[in-house]
Amino acid sequence: MVRSASLLILVFLLQSCAALFPKPQRPRYPRYDQAYKKPPRGFDNIKKKVALLPFFNESPFGKEDLAITASEEFRKELSRARDYIFDDEGAAIFGESRDIYAGGGMKLATLARKAKISGINLVIYGRIVDAKVTQKADEIGLVRKTRSYAESILEIKVFDVQANKEVYSSKKDGNVNDSSYKLFNAEREAAIEYQRGLLRYSIKVAARRFVPDVAKLGAKLDWTGRVAKIIGSKIYINAGRVSGINKGDILRVLTDGSDIFDPETGAMLGVSKGQVKGTLEVIDYFGEDGAVAVLHSGGTVTEGDFVQLY
């Protein structure tokens, strides 16, 4: 009788230890709709070149590791929307998200012209506003039921280089929770690592929640490219097959727009659309992602002119 009771107690303790650090139950989070993978009919399907600046962490928890996790997760999920090409060299123009926030966003407006020349359409940057893990446990017993709560808030902003203005700003949370059974006085290091894992998952959930918004945004904004070189009758464009340019596409050639300021406050309102100089017809591709075009209609085209799908 005593032996049977001892065996039952031993089995109970082993089962409790096995449940010491179970994997967190993944909460359901919204994923972008399948319709976002291809732009709706009526919008051009040319991919926009994006400069994704590394996010930074303002909270006292998670440090740089959490910021890297948020940046990588957002990039991975947004790449599935198929509306964007990530331009790492272009991102170097602006630095990191921390630099943009430190300057109040003025750095974006200052470098917009340089970004246009490099072919960037959008700049995406962000920060972790808050991140923490809290726990609630039973007061009594050797094996205690513990519920862990991970809370995070991520802010992401999108800057339209062509319009020279911010076109999206939002904050989303990634709150998750998990229940587990833990032995009283369990190893502290294991508990801390468990909390870190839950916090990483929380910020991933927050990053994923931005994908539907940003995917829709990319489908609605105009793509803008640039005349990179002119050799004889051939005009070379800084976007091609990878970006979604097709042979036979007609591109309109535009002059650079003018900055528009509020006469009362002096604040910049945006950039006007440039004047149409003519149209080009795409006849071939070159390099990794470039297109060759010829003059279709209109007057003189010069290197540095901007182009849009007609």
Segments the model singles out, each with a brief description of its role:
Residues F61-E72, G105, A109, T146-Y149, ...:
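Soluble non-cytosolic domains of exported or imported proteins
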Residues L122, A219-D222, V271-G278:
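Short coil-to-beta-strand transition motifs
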Residues A18-I46, D160-G232, K247, R252, ...:
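C-terminal/domain-edge helix-coil "capping" segments
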Residues I250-G287, H296:
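C-terminal soluble interaction/assembly domains
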Residues Y125-K182:
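Amphipathic beta-strand/beta-sheet edge segments enriched in Tyr/Trp
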Residues K47-P54, E58-V129, K165-S169, N246, ...:
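N-terminal segment of the mature soluble domain
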Residues M1-S4:
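Positively charged n-region of N-terminal signal peptides that target proteins for export
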Residues S6-Q15:
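Bacterial N-terminal signal peptides
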